[in-house]
Amino acid sequence: MGGTQRPRRGRSGGAPSVADVARLAGVSTQTVSRVSGGARNVRADTREKVLRAMERLGYSPNRAAQALRRGSFRTIGVVTQHIERTGEALTTEGVLAAAWRAGYTVSMIQVERPASEDMRTAVLHLAHQGVDGLVVVQAGRADSRHLVLPADVPVAVSDSALVGYYPSASADQVRGARAAVDHLLGLGHREVHHVTGPQDSQSALIRSATWAARLRESGIEPPEPVQGDWTAASGYAAGERLAADPRVTAVFCANDEAAIGLIRAMHERGRRVPQDVSVVGFDGLSLGEYSFPPLTTVRQDFRRAGEEMVRLVLEQVDSGAAGGERQILIPTELVVRGSTAPRRERT
């Protein structure tokens, strides 16, 4: 007869114990304890046997008691901003996945603004919860002089002014922005305009500074950038402004959403992309594949940034040593699609 198999009882007839799990899995009770505690120094096949035995017996370890015994709740605190934005959401997904694989849970706080005071409040709240480590996904331009992270808690950060002061994992913004500008210059465009990201974003500032520096290296004075805020609406507004200038033939947008908004504005005002205006975005979001035309962009691996930050935190947890100022730069990749083309001479 079908149906869900009922959990077995332990030898004494009561709830199953660690010894019952060990007996069924053919391992020691110490191994069962290591698996239930999330330890990583257990062979994959052994872990699988123990987990199957737990499931078959209906065994559930007392997490609170385990935490009290070892002085750790196996929890990573995460501070993020704009979780509704695709990039931050993907990075947070990477954090969650890596933490889960390592046997850790996540306690997350989303701040409304990346101001130092908001960040400080969130960090202190998580530290008081007794988290084993902290991951700061987005701190914007929060000043390291005014935002001091707890010295006794392992920390990793990404894409903020805190990079260089704490262990970090971030996309190589400089190489990515240079690749975007070089691509447009290589197509013969004599000037590359720029739609920025918000001024409280460290990654946006790096992309803008790299754009300007690369143009100057090529003997070109950068035109006045157009302020954006990551949204498609800001890109659309920038596109309306730039479309009115017939001299504009190339635009580097600080992110994909703004680039897609700009492309629509160009089309609506009779400027064809890429025949009249070439457009490059940044991020490599999947929606760029389905824009019209498909968007040339700089792809960054958001999920890997989250995974690397967890790895940096757990290395500090395992070693008991601070991570110093170690920086992991994650490579970016120029993805050439249909929104860029060689510059056409005006007739």
Language-model features, listed with the residues they occupy:
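Periplasmic-binding protein-like
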Residues: H128-Q138, H193-V195, P225-V226, P246-N255, ...
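Short beta-strand segments enriched in small/hydrophobic residues
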Residues: T31-R34, L68-E84, L90, H183, ...
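Flexible loop/turn connectors
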Residues: R11, D245-T347
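Short acidic/polar active-site loop segments enriched in Thr and Asp
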Residues: S28, R74, D132, H189-E191, ...
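N-terminal helix-turn-helix DNA-binding module of bacterial transcription factors
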Residues: M1-R74, R344
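Hinge/beta->alpha junction and helix N-cap segments in small-molecule ligand-binding domains
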Residues: R63, Q81-L90, M108-E117, A169-A179, ...
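Alpha-helical recognition/docking segments in bacterial nutrient-uptake
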Residues: M1-T4, G13, T75-D182, G186
